[in-house]
A protein has these predicted regions:
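Regulatory cytosolic signal-relay segments
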Residues: 1-36, 268, 282
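Catalytic NTP-binding/metal-coordinating core of nucleotidyl cyclase/transferase enzymes
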Residues: 1-5, 28-108, 152
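Short, flexible loop/turn motifs enriched in small residues
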Residues: 33-37, 127, 208
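Alpha-helical scaffold within the catalytic cores of cyclic-nucleotide enzymes
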Residues: 65-81, 92, 96-132, 136, ...
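Cytosolic regulatory/linker segments at or just downstream of nucleotide-handling modules
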Residues: 139, 169-241, 251-283
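Cytochrome P450 core scaffold surrounding the K-helix E-X-X-R motif
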Residues: 143-146
Length: 286
């Protein structure tokens, strides 16, 4: 009976969570059990799901979410990750060993999404798109609640940062963004995949900008162009970050890049920022 209880419980709280807390069984868990350790957090989210959801019935909504998660969630486990929770169409996953595992998961997910969309197209449904944010930091894992209702949770600013990186993918028009902190946690990250520096980006709750990178994936139609123009883009960002007066010179910084690779969606972030500084030169740069 205890085995069946643990198996049922594992569908809601992963066995790895019990291991982190030093517990053998769900019945050993107590309110306030906790542990602190460094991990990598991966956040995924379906783009524009709200507008898509409004066009479907409740049954269709849940069918889509469960179908999508059934394709994506196993990828996390196959690469050493733990699914902490589903938040609607979003996945929050933890990787206790290396951010390389999270990068592998993200790239496989992108490939699976392409295959998944082929099936949706054949069925007459619109394609889905997704954003992925990856960050590494110290987490507190533990049990919260009260006597009659307890649940596992993760508390950390690193979780908020990973979620904000996923949101950044929309602003930059890219699929996968990883933080400098994640790359620094394991040097193997830089050897495993192609990266493109996107800048030191101001995030809510941080006094300094966080260095972020795009993880390039071969399925991207602009993959080769991004690699070919990577150094020029990096130089433009460095020049932009060094500007004292972004109202006057910010657009000039990207003028050459616009001529070479105007299709680069990441340009929109900086051009929009340039417009902001033109309209509000004394405003909050965040």
């Amino acid at each position: 009976e205890l085995v069946r209880t643990n198996q049922a419980f594992a569908r809601f709280v992963p066995d790895e969570f019990l291991n982190f807390l030093g517990k053998e069984s769900v019945i050993d868990i107590n309110l306030g059990d906790q542990v602190q350790r460094q991990m990598t957090i991966l956040f995924t989210d379906i783009r524009n799901f709200t507008s898509l959801s409004e066009q479907m019935t409740p049954r269709e909504n849940f069918a889509l979410i469960n179908s999508y998660l059934n394709h994506m969630a196993p990828v996390v486990r196959q690469h050493g990750g733990i699914i902490d929770k589903y938040i609607g169409d979003s996945i929050m996953a933890l990787y206790p060993d290396s951010p390389v595992q999270a990068i592998k998961s993200a790239l496989v997910m992108r490939g699976l999404l392409k295959e998944y969309n082929r099936g949706r197209k054949r069925a007459g449904y619109p394609p889905l798109d997704m954003g992925i944010g990856i960050h590494t930091g110290v987490l507190m894992l533990g049990i919260i609640g009260e006597e009659h209702r307890m649940e596992s949770t993760v508390i950390s600013d690193a979780v908020n940062t990973a979620s904000r990186l996923e949101n950044l993918t929309k602003l930059f028009g890219v699929s996968i963004i990883i933080s400098q902190a994640a790359l620094d946690a394991d040097p193997a990250c830089r050897d495993f995949c192609e990266l493109r520096y996107l800048g030191a980006i101001p995030l809510k709750g941080r006094s300094q900008g966080l260095g972020v990178y795009e993880v390039l994936h071969p399925d991207d139609s602009t993959y080769e162009a991004k690699i070919a123009n990577r150094e020029l883009f990096h130089n433009c960002i460095a020049a932009w970050e060094a500007l004292q007066d972004r109202k006057q010179g910010s657009r000039d910084v990207f003028a050459q890049y616009l001529k070479v690779f105007p299709e680069d969606s990441a340009l929109n972030y900086y051009l929009n920022r340039s417009e902001y500084f033109f309209l509000f030169p004394d405003g909050d740069k965040k």
